[in-house]
Swiss-Prot record:
HTH rrf2-type domain sequence ranges: 2-133
Domain of life where this protein originates: Bacteria
Cysteines joined through disulfide linkages: none
Organism the protein comes from: Aquifex aeolicus (strain VF5)
Protein name: Putative HTH-type transcriptional regulator aq_268
Keyword DNA-binding included in the entry's annotation: yes
Amino acid sequence: MIFSDTVRYALIALAYLALNRDRLVKVEEIAKVHKIPRPFLAKVMHELSKRGVVYSVKGPRGGFSLAKEPDKITIWDIIELFGDAYKYEMCLLMPHKCSEFADNPCIVHHKWEELKSQIQDFFKGTTIKDLINIEEKHLFPVSR
């Protein structure tokens, strides 16, 4: 499973803000550094602001900053915020939620349930702080 562009861009932007906590950061800067379409990123940032994940300051000296500590924002929080959690509840073989047919599961149901639970636990236990700690080891390029 991969993240939607919306979730991916949100995670990149949040990690970038966490690495630049001493100042307000403009959407244009994040978009340029990470080659993200500015209009798309602006919508993502607006939603993060509406939901209280980031602060937004308007004006020529404005920009964005984190509204929460990086260790208080999980990957799962962002997945849920953008409505992508359903992807992690879907059957691998059928176009429905696994739970909808629990009495007649598909052939990979039990293995998938186990793995799906591990994936969700990983996302719920991984924070923006974890992502920037990885960045400091040069494995997650959010500051370049």
